Amino acid sequence: LNTATKEELMTLSGVGESRADSIIAYREENGRFQNTEELMQISGIKEGLYNKIKDNITV
């Protein structure tokens, strides 16, 4: 999550251009992710999506 490009984020199931942009914006505004669960702090990323992608992401 801390080094992924927009294109890399978009390879995750359920993550399109808008969500990838939101992840990058969150990272730029708040600094590095401390854990993967922090992803759910982003608007539009709920527990269901997190559970679908959590095995494919790391900080």
Residue map of PLM features:
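Extended, structured, electrostatic nucleic-acid-contact surfaces
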Residues: L1-S13, A25, E29-R32, T36-Q41, ...
